[in-house]
Regions:
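Residues within helix-turn-helix
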Residues: 1
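Hydrophobic Walker B segment
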Residues: 4-7, 39
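Short, glycine/charged-rich "phosphate-handling" switch motifs in NTP-dependent
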Residues: 9, 21, 30
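Catalytic metal- and UDP-sugar-binding loop of GT-A-like glycosyltransferases, i.e.
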Residues: 12-13, 82
Length: 160
């Protein structure tokens, strides 16, 4: 956080290796690797393994989460990243829900809503103010405003 606010350029390293060098905006908006994506930003980026369904639509196995990536040629598993600040929760029926609200962390100007999406996976959405949903509510996750960050499952490198 401090480096993001004070620096013109940042070097992100892992295990003695340079992962990415760039401006705070470049590193936050276009992380070069999955490591950088998970390291920069609070709360951390939601990162999941996903597999292709049809024409750019991917699903996180064992969960109700499906994401349109607009990558029709995708045929293999990938890692997908979604920033909590770009995702929102919406009340839903049990049948239509992607998950259930597990925890709400009210932090004043915003609240972190932690959703159990099944398969042992948790999804964090950052809502402004105090959310209308409650713990135990069934919800869908609105990804309309979310930038989709796609990483190679083997190398961790950004795709596209």
């Amino acid at each position: 956080e401090e480096a993001m606010s004070l620096s013109h350029k940042i070097a992100v390293m892992s295990r003695g290796r340079l992962e990415q060098y760039g401006s705070p905006e470049e590193i936050y908006s276009r992380p070069a690797t999955e490591f950088v994506a998970g390291f920069v930003g609070k709360p951390r980026m939601n990162l999941f393994t996903a597999e292709p369904l049809e024409r750019g639509l991917v699903a996180v196995p064992g969960t109700g989460l499906k994401v349109d990536l607009e990558l029709p040629e995708l045929r293999e598993k990938i890692r997908i990243g979604l920033r909590p600040s770009e995702c929102h929760v919406v009340s839903a029926s049990e049948e239509a829900a992607a998950g259930r609200v597990a925890v709400i962390e009210p932090l004043g100007a915003y609240s972190d809503v932690i959703v159990d999406i099944g398969g042992g996976e948790l999804f964090v959405a950052r809502e402004s103010g105090f959310p209308e949903v409650r713990v135990g509510d069934h919800v869908t996750i609105d990804l309309r405003d979310a930038v989709r960050h796609v990483f190679d499952i083997e190398t961790g490198l950004r795709r596209g």
